[in-house]
């Protein structure tokens, strides 16, 4: 046994506030930071809800404007609209409220403002490795108030879709990381069950792919294994129970989402994520749903490549793991995850999600490009293998 060697990159996240009723701390958080002109970003559904009134009420006079046009997969046009609104009120901060779409919309718009250029035009369809360039060094504080489990609020990377090609790219910069995250499970009670579950599967996918990444670390393995265990225990109960019980389970799911992606900029994510990044915008499939579809197949693929790294996954799933029979245990983990997904009313195949089989080869190249740039798989993954995995996930 040798001593651990490496390095760990921390983001600029400063505070995570969690628990029922904690949205009421938002005003004090803005005051503490001296922020007076915050723009809140959300989608059309939450934009019509009383929950938005609760959030803006907590902000008080510090709410300068509300943008309610965030949309799935972050179309570049919505980013430009938000950027214009933030410039109009000379925003000093942005509050994202909802799931991954408003969170990423806020990040990419912030990138446009901080760099004095349209950040959507330079987004790259890879692993978000290209840092945002330029700007005058100023800050634009982002506070995230998530209502799903996609966990994008824990990274400084934001995805955006080019509407002309339906290819998703992204931007990354330490300044894009939300500085404060407020996890109030009460705000998730109106999240549709299918969306809550699907984003929970996205968190599960984060944890699984962090563990078998070649960039995995002891810290990320430990937290990812705990995330898996928490999701297995609490995700089903979170939608089957009501009232205080549901809040308890939802709060544990929010902790799982946090743990699943802790250190994600160190581990990065692999084949399932790369597929999801392109399946989503191409066929308008929510990213949580893409994880429901691709994760078990990619786990079986990785069982042949890196079975020795499935130990923490097995721990989280309650599967007996023996290094002498690692591949069999890894395959059992994949089966266990597929069975777990099957209990929920979400699409389980690409066919169920409305994907056109004859179009599958069209995304092989951008998926391959992301995998190659991420460099988290032990060996190269070729286009034929990508297409074979997508075909397996079709039905």
How does the language model describe each region?
Residues 1-93, 350-351:
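ATP/NTP phosphate-donor binding region
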Residues 23-26, 48-51, 76, 101-107, ...:
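Short glycine/serine/threonine-rich phosphate/pyrophosphate-binding segments
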Residues 24, 115-218, 311-312, 316:
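A glycine/threonine-rich phosphate-anchoring loop and its flanking beta-alpha core
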Residues 52-55, 82-83, 102-116, 155-156:
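Short Gly/Thr/Asp-enriched flexible loops that form oxyanion-binding sites at enzyme active sites
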Residues 210-336:
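Active-site segments that bind and position negatively charged phosphate/pyrophosphate groups
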Residues 320-395:
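C-terminal charged capping/lid subdomain of soluble metabolic enzymes
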């Amino acid at each position: 046994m040798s001593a651990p060697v490496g390095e760990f990159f921390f983001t600029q996240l400063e505070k995570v506030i969690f628990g029922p009723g904690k949205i009421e701390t938002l005003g004090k958080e803005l005051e503490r930071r001296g922020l007076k002109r915050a723009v809140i970003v959300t989608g059309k559904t939450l934009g019509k809800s009383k929950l938005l009134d609760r959030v803006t009420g907590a902000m008080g006079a510090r709410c300068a404007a509300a943008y309610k046009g965030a949309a799935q997969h972050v179309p570049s046009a919505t980013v430009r609209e938000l950027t214009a609104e933030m410039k109009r009120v000379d925003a000093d901060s942005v509050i994202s409220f909802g799931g991954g779409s408003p969170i990423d919309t806020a990040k990419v718009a912030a990138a446009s403002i901080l760099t004095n250029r349209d950040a959507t035009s330079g987004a790259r369809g890879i692993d978000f490795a290209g840092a945002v360039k330029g700007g005058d060094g100023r800050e634009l504080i982002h506070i995230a108030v998530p209502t799903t489990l996609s966990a994008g609020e824990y990274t400084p990377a934001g995805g955006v879709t080019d509407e002309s090609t339906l290819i998703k790219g992204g931007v990354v910069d330490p300044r894009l990381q939300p500085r404060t995250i407020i996890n109030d499970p009460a705000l998730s009670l109106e999240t549709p069950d299918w969306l809550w579950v699907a984003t929970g599967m996205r968190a599960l996918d984060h944890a699984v792919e962090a563990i078998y990444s070649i960039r995995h670390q002891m810290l990320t393995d430990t937290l990812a294994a705990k995330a898996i265990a928490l999701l297995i225990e609490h995700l089903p109960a979170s939608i089957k129970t009501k009232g205080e019980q549901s809040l308890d389970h939802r709060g544990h799911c929010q902790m799982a989402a946090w743990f699943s992606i802790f250190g994600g900029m160190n581990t990065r994510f692999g084949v399932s994520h790369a597929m999801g990044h392109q399946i989503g915008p191409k066929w308008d499939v929510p990213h949580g749903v893409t994880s429901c579809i691709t994760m078990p197949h990619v786990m079986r693929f990785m069982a042949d490549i890196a079975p020795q790294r499935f130990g923490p996954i097995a721990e989280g799933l309650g599967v007996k793991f023996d290094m002498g029979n690692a591949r069999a245990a890894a395959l059992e983990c994949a089966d266990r995850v597929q069975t777990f997904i099957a209990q929920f009313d979400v699409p389980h195949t690409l066919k169920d999600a409305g994907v056109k089989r004859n179009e599958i080869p069209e995304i092989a190249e951008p998926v391959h490009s992301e995998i190659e740039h991420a460099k988290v798989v032990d060996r190269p993954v070729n286009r034929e293998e990508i297409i074979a995995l997508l075909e397996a996930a079709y039905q």
